[in-house]
Amino acid sequence: MLNKLVECENLTFEESYELFNMLLEESEIRIAAYLTALQTKGVTADEIAGFAKAMRDNAVKIDLGEVTDTCGTGGDGSKTINVSTAVSIILACFTKVAKHGNVSVTSKSGSANVYEALGCKILENPDEAKVSIEKTNFAFLFAPKYHPALKKIMPVRSELKIKTVFNILGPLANPANPKYQILGVNSPELSEKVANALSKVGGVKKALVINGNGLDELNPNGASKITEYNGKFETYEITPEDFGLENTKIIPCESPNESARRLIDVFSGKINEDRNFILMNAGAALYASEIVSDFLEGVEIAKNAIDSGKVLKKLEMIKNV
């Protein structure tokens, strides 16, 4: 298959699935060659899907029932608060959430970094995750604990220092096989491709693949692109006005501790720019999870959950599980 990639020929879903499994047994130099050739050619939806399905199939097994995930690819180079973590905690007030996450790669506040800064502990195994979701509606699935098969590939990725298909795979490889998903991508060109790949992996009923003018979140200060999948695909542009919100600037964030503090400020009812940023994305997540029928309703119930103290109480439950 390496020759095929070098000749810039696309792989099928089945070939991509097979290639992922081959890479687990390959030498480091051949892993690097495959990943570089695939990246140089340009990755397709079938290739992303084949890799993602194989990654799920090689993951530690976990069954949490019907869950939602709020996960982004990261890699947008922005210094923002960790919005997806905030959204996942709000969402857990209404439905089961299995948040697939990792430490920071490019941002100042990866989801696992912020999760720990909030005072929550990393769950060690599927049994602990099941207890957490039963007690709180929330489980944080720390990616390295569920994808041990990747131990050989990860050092090669680090050594290469280029983007590879693995920069896209994280949100598509949740071992809990989420039925609902809001998935951030770091480039608008990826939204349709990743939505298509997610549909091919299977198991998802409804998903929003989002990009906020370069952010892997919806942008509170301009237009964002969404590709919605619910058995069929629809791509459209939205602005904060569609959520009943005013345009607000994004305040940079310098550390996981700062991100955690600012999330708690919002959960405590503080009215500021971060609140709008979080409400916009929470409204979309509630819509993606089929809890509400439109974005406006999603924002309203997210507001009510925050202002009633429900979200702060949910965070305390998660910390004490």
From Swiss-Prot:
Cofactor(s) required for function per UniProt: Mg(2+)
Keyword hit for Nucleus: no
Pfam families: Glycos_trans_3N, Glycos_transf_3
Pathway note: Amino-acid biosynthesis; L-tryptophan biosynthesis; L-tryptophan from chorismate: step 2/5
UniProt xrefs under NCBIfam families: trpD
Family: Belongs to the anthranilate phosphoribosyltransferase family.
Protein name: Anthranilate phosphoribosyltransferase
Organism classification: Archaea, Methanobacteriati, Methanobacteriota, Methanomada group, Methanococci
